[in-house]
Amino acid sequence: MASLDISDPDITKYIKLVQDGNPANRWIVFSYVPKSNNKIKFCDSGSGDLKELREELDDSSIRFAYIRFVINNMPKFVYIPWCGDGVNGPIKGAFSGHAIEFSKSFKPIHHQVNARSEEDIDEKAITAALNKATGASYDSGSKVQGATKGTFIPQSVSQGREAATKSNAEVKNVINKNDYNKIQESAEYWKQNQANKSEPAKPTRPEYNLSTERDDYWKQQQAEKQKQQQQQQQQQASRVNAPPPSRTVGNKFQEQVSKPTETAPPQPRPAPSKGSVLNRFPAATQQQQEPPAPSRPAAPVPSRVNKPAAPVQPVYQEPVHEEPQYEEPQYEEEQQQQYEEQPTEEQQYYQEEPQQQYEEQPTEEQQYYQEEQQQYEEQPTEEQQYYQEEQQQYEQPTEDQQYYQEEQQQYEQPAEEQYDQSGYLQAKALYDYNGENDGDLSFREGDIITILDQSDPDGWWQGSLPTGEQGFFPSNFVQQL
């Protein structure tokens, strides 16, 4: 396509006359030079309106028109490239490019109309478009809160400014009453939504809301649960403080002492001899085939006859489950008790004497005897060491001890939650429930329900009965075991 030739000086001359507001030249028309498809020439001009210009446009020609309008005392310019329906095809293809290129010579252009027939050139449509153009329409807005304003069009700049500066009070009078109703409805809707959010989460159905009786029942259940927890804590504390059950030689001796004495007359025991404790375990001595341990040396006997007996020290029980060194005094205490149960003639004589006389004035011999006894108890002899080795062999837990330990472990395990054989949680029905919808689980008060799913945030759980029925039920009708 050849470039457009606008070298004719009349083109710029007449364009200038139209833009300057010359009354004799309101519109101008340009066309191609005959036998040329790219050179433009001046065709005609006039002082009339758009109807006069339309007479210069026919179906078999191409024209470029430029017309001046006055809108609100302001000049507005319209560019109309015209291509009739009877124009040849090749010329139509070049026309679109020439129209765009020629529009650069018409400045300013407030509106452009690409016309193909007389119906495209409508004066009312062009005037409305110019009113909406920048700087031409002084309307403050065609719509206010959904209502359309009147068809008032300002005829001057002062009228446009007055319409644009109307007060808000006058604008509110135009608002439709339906808008007020919509505002009120939306406000009530949001109030209800906010009120529903503040309430605690409960099942969606209103007929399953908790009543005051159920609230009292749950409070009572919580109080009982707290009491049970306190009792369990107290029992655990007492079990920690109490020694574990054991079956040692010292415990057997204490059980025999605590039993009521039989009616049979007590028979005197023989005096303790060497290896008296070892005689209790003949099987172990035969297997080891070791010589008997040396016997405990006898305590020194004071020379004075009126010497009181040594004060009996309390016997403290040592737990079996601890290290063997704490079990060491058991044999020593047992042996000491045997000596105390069978007093010799000298000890009987000492016990017959009143002890109060000697307790008020302790002699030097008593102090010496007490110090020597402490040294003897602090330093274990070879016989005590042998007893310790013997005891370690027989400290293996018997069947009774294993049974006591297993029973104690079972008792110390806290009962947290009950599970069925499949590993699911269980719950107990507090009220009767008849399912109204498909998929609901019906049950009676006291039924045991296996809980399958608790993920519903609205409080509807899925469970099954022992009969095999499955379904959904409200969580506030059951108590988890």
Curated annotation (Swiss-Prot):
Protein keywords: Actin-binding, Cell projection, Coiled coil, Cytoplasm, Cytoskeleton, SH3 domain
Q: Where is the composition biased (Pro residues)?
A: 291-300
Residue ranges annotated as compositionally biased, kind Low complexity, are: 228-237, 336-413
Location within or outside the cell: Cytoplasm, Cytoskeleton; Cell projection, Pseudopodium
Write out the GO cellular component annotations.
cell leading edge; cortical actin cytoskeleton; phagocytic cup lip; phagocytic vesicle; pseudopodium; site of polarized growth
In the record, biological process GO terms are: actin filament bundle assembly; aggregation involved in sorocarp development; cell motility; establishment or maintenance of cell polarity; negative regulation of phagocytosis; phagosome maturation; pseudopodium assembly; regulation of actin filament polymerization
- Give me the stretches of Acidic residues compositional bias: 325-335
What is the purpose of this protein? Actin-binding adapter protein. Binds to F-actin but is not involved in actin polymerization, capping or bundling. Does not bind G-actin. Controls pseudopodium number and motility in early stages of chemotactic aggregation.
Protein name (record): Drebrin-like protein
High-level lineage: Eukaryota, Amoebozoa, Evosea, Eumycetozoa, Dictyostelia
Recorded name of the encoding gene: abpE-1
